[in-house]
């Protein structure tokens, strides 16, 4: 009988922890406190709560982030993995298609067009792989279930909501990397805010669809970080 009681007790305890661990984000105190303290997110508080209610944790994203190739591999291994013949071919085609803008960026920012093209290739294979993770799910998980970097990702989450609001995007549909980066150049939300620029003259910054905006934004990012032409990059 005592054994049965212990099993029942353990079952109830396990159930309690499951409720705590898997509580909906819109019901968690830490999430609601963040929401209360966050500056305007564009969307109303009720809208944000609704998005959070539809978002589930993605625990697998933490080991993916921790074991990212750029964190684990030496340059030789990283180069072997990313600098492939197919990617080089794409790079040649990309540079040919966007020669005029790459040359313009080199002239106006000092960043070599070949460097801009190379970064677009490394980051997303020239837009072919801009990430398949739901960005809201990633950022919410990393904001509240990854304590070591929670403050950083909470800033990204807030900026992600502002970005979606300003561009008319559905936060539930946006996809990106395991770190919440989006677009051909893989900009995290705060970098999107600070460094993304309009490259095609349509008075709109769109790193999800405009290659011209991505080219200009990559160049601007490097220029704003004091890119020095001819300096060693490795």
Where are these regions (language model features)?
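Cell-wall glycan-active module
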Residues: 1-154, 159-175, 180, 190-234
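Functionally critical loop-and-helix segments that line ligand-binding/catalytic clefts
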Residues: 186
């Amino acid at each position: 009988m005592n054994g049965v009681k212990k099993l029942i007790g353990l079952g109830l305890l396990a159930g309690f922890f499951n409720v705590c661990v898997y509580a909906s984000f819109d019901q968690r105190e830490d999430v609601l406190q963040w929401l209360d303290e966050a500056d305007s997110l564009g969307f109303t508080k009720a809208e944000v709560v609704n998005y959070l209610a539809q978002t589930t944790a993605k625990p697998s994203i933490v080991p993916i982030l921790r074991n990212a190739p750029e964190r684990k591999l030496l340059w030789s291994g990283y180069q072997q993995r990313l600098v492939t013949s197919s990617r080089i071919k794409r790079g040649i085609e990309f540079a040919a298609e966007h020669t005029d803008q790459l040359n313009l960026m080199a002239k106006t920012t000092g960043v070599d067009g070949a460097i801009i093209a190379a970064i677009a290739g490394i980051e997303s294979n020239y837009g072919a792989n801009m990430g398949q993770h739901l960005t809201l799910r990633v950022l919410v998980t990393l904001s509240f279930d990854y304590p070591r970097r929670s403050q950083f990702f909470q800033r990204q989450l807030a900026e992600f909501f502002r970005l979606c609001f300003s561009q008319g995007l559905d936060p539930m549909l946006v996809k990106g990397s395991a770190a919440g980066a989006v677009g051909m150049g893989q900009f995290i939300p705060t970098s999107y805010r600070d460094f993304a620029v309009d490259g095609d003259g349509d008075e709109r910054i769109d790193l999800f669809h405009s290659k011209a905006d991505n080219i200009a934004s990559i160049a601007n990012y490097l220029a704003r970080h004091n890119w020095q032409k001819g300096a060693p990059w490795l």
